[in-house]
């Protein structure tokens, strides 16, 4: 576009383009070169000197011509943009708002240029009907070009306007450039410099040099930088000052006016440049820019013009937009300046228009700042909230009655809006007429102007006049309202002030909810809200509907996310809550008068209940009640007085309140019932949006905060609510379709008119926008207009259709919520509900069949054909160029629109069907719950029977539905079937159900496959299918294939179902071993192989894999566990075991894992040569010799490693030299030793610990004998690792659930002494150590599992003592004496769990009765062992007493068992007998020994004194130490 020298490089190949005036103007701009214009100022100062030579005259003449050329280019470019000949590309923001702002704000319209170019003006008049949209890059280049050629060595603030016409022309250069930037940005909303940060820096620097205060501007001469010229100019200025003082006064005033206007226009341009471009400002430019703007925005500085301060504040806000943390170190400075200005302005605010506008600008900039500066309100928000509450109600008479305010509101809203538009049009017409009739120019009141007028240089008279009425003109520039509209103007400014105040509060509540929570009492009512001004005051008394809506939005923001804060509410009755006040608010405008009152009056108004004390939790309760009452009061008002937009926002507030309010703590069902009664009439509203929002609120009432049937039934009966909901579902369209169609037609006409005004040619480059002929441009505009009309009509139709469908969806969700929580209410209408839901599903199926929806393969073929056709069309269209491209765009848009409508309708229909099936899911859950609760009501049985009859009739058509959500819902419905429901079905229906679920496992969509896998895992638990070996075999085979699915959700559900299957197989083998043997061994082999392959998959999968592997290790027999080739990937297949069946399943399985098709085809095809041994046509692998067999296995293993999916890359199942048991244990150990501490991996660890305990339940697993450990050492290499891993986890794992499972695995009921082997002592000491450290909890969240862990450790201790041998008791003396208290407490705690027998404990050598000891034990006890001390506390009661506790309610499966406990007592008794005659024990050991004796004998009472003395000795010994 432009070369390095600044010359234009536009292609001139087209002669027509070279004669185009638009092209000529742009070419002239890009050909401009920089000249030294400061010589004109020096020549102007030395105009009395006659010694100028000819060379200087030539230079001055060239500079003058260059100055005129610059002004001509700027004026013509301004005219082009004003007449919309040139336009910038609009942003995706609504352009109507930007255009209205553009028309409302006025810039000074200068006088005509003294030396205009007549040719350019004529050409412009001939081509004003052509609109050319310039790209953003070209606009930026134009602006940068002007910025580079304009002089930077001139101090514009010191130029004398009356000095000469040249001075006046020089000062117009930056003024015109600023006006051009503002004009461009108003249409485009902002000029984006994301890809042009250097250009932005150049423009900002230019205007920053102009707007800097004189204190900051460096001393720069107004003439060329030479000492002679500067001295001469100073002498001449002194002479002029001495000659006439009056002329100096006039020149100084004009100088001040020029300085002010130039700075204001430059600030406007800078503000436009900074809008949304803050992140593009370089770090070097940030500090000087912010310092300059902060200084100019100082409200206390009287030397700065008021409008300058206001626009500087606006610029600060625009600078903060989208900056994030880039300006974090400057946010505090900006906030301090804005807050200080806000405090000073509001301290003496009155009806002055400028003060109101200035306050509004501060509020807007502060909002933009708070959105970016996180945490800035944590320390600097105390005084701000009080000021904002004051401004919320500024200009509102809050003492007005409710009805009068509502009536006045809408009369003003509609009539004043029309009146304002008419007055604006009249004002613009008057301005245009005055401009055309005025001969001397003057100040124009419209920046847009007329197409026949062109902006030029502003004269001194116009500048002086524009500043004479500064306050009025400043208002007119920004709003376009004349003085005749003063009443409307004042209302508009006050409404805007309140609007921005509430918007700022909304932003503060959204970005700092914790800080704002402390100020709830300022803005929310704790008493009936007419007494105190709150947010409800704005919602009810404000005359502007926009403020009502934004106040409701503010209330919604306050409530949203407050659920955690509202937990602290207190519903206790507090006294003195309602008080009678001696004084009431009767002033006409108490909020306005508050600004002029002192702080004492403010406190009196804000704290009306200061005489009583209530806690904050009680205030929260009162606030919630008043919020409900206020919303209900607004909803109950006559809807004719309330606009739909406000009603919709109120309903959104209600929805947010229902979600966040803790109704269970309020314990006030009357609030919910009254709220439901207030919302119910809106479900029949004409507006679909209000109707939809009200249905959402009711759904949340039924679902999130369900009412009881007693509370809900009267409200539903009074409003006929259920019948209305069912009518919505039964009717295709609502009753208000005609009204909606009329509204749509009106909207279409309005949109068509808007489209007619925007006939634009989109172009990305300047050449493409200039090459097209005018006729081609008009044709293209017509085609675009037609396409937009068709597209808009389709959008309106689809939108209307969507609204009706969304209403039906919400109705279905309401029925589902009623079914979930209050199914008894819906039983009265259950027949009608069934008929409506089935009819919706049938209608959907018929629509799918009639529309010709095909499978995914056919769709892919059609897409490929369409792509080929499009490619052919593109090749043909390249030859025909633009016309064919336009036709193609039309066809594609029409085709896309029709496809979008079809897709939208299909998706909506599928969603309706999906929600119908979700409602069926809730019905099946309710029926299942009734079976669990043993509900014998006949209505439930009839409802259940009718449902399944209807559902199975429509089931065949649902299974072939093209939408996966519907097929997945079928599986979810079947997952809610219980055992009784399944048994009540006929055999045909049972077979149909199972076949459908198993068939959907192989669906094309992963959503359906995952749901089907989950359903299989639930069906396995049904009693009728427990004994079905075929079902179990088929389920195992299908789930095994799903374990290799690509989608992770499918693998998670399949693995969970496989774990359930393995759980069932464990119980099946123990109870029905014959039925267990009917399951094919090959299927179990595939299950094990898939589990081992998945043991290193995603942690969500591994948590179920380790559970299934533990169960498998529990029920597998010895032949499977100690086999090397049982689960090898390519196992040998015996010809006697159904070759064809097995080969088919294996090929399917390997196909599901992926990568084995070539090998299986090579084996079974019989045609190709294969290094793996050839094929015989039957699919079996028959190696010829042993060497070929080894080679074959090596090749198979290599191919398998290359073909496994990524999740199996770390699998250990490829080891051939390991037995199955070693591979299972190795997998479990690696999962138990997982170092990650995330929740998913922790779940893997505790399931792996539980699975390791299942190994000790299998009696076929060989453990080493004490006599011959070396013989079986090869079969249990994993045993040391198992014990060391479990001991480590039991002692040091942070997660207590993992420690609990590790402890239970170390002491299973089948854990014999032989299974512990040499690790018995390590386990015993580890359990005692863990019990001693049970109170050391590192994570407080684990404290809830502390008691369960202690109980499990005590059970493990009793079991370990019971398995102790007699010959090794002496080796544990230190443990018994060191941990005596722990052992005694463990036995005492479990005396409630253990049933106490009537007979004494049987022993092999001794026997004792309940009243005396045996003959062998009597001398032992009578010599040295003290008996028990009987106390009244349960904790010290002996384990075995003469009176048995009541154990009828205790479960028999609790541990420790009687056998374990008896053996443990025998070991303790034997330990005490071994230390009976030992005289070397100290007193502490004797005390511990006596405590142990309490566990089995307490009958001797002669040793009470001796035992008490031992206790005294023990206590004195502790005190002495």
Swiss-Prot record:
Which residue stretches belong to region Disordered?
Answer: 1-20, 85-124, 218-254, 431-482, 735-797, 1398-1455
Q: Does the keyword Cytoplasm apply?
A: no
Domain of life, per UniProt, equals Eukaryota
Annotated coiled-coil positions are 853-903
Coiled coil is among the record's keywords: yes
Q: Which UniProt keywords apply?
A: Coiled coil
Spell out the Low complexity composition-biased ranges.
94-108, 219-254, 431-454, 465-482, 735-762, 775-788, 1398-1453
Q: Compositional bias (Polar residues) at which positions?
A: 455-464, 763-774
Q: What is this protein called?
A: Putative uncharacterized protein DDB_G0272456
Organism listed in the record: Dictyostelium discoideum
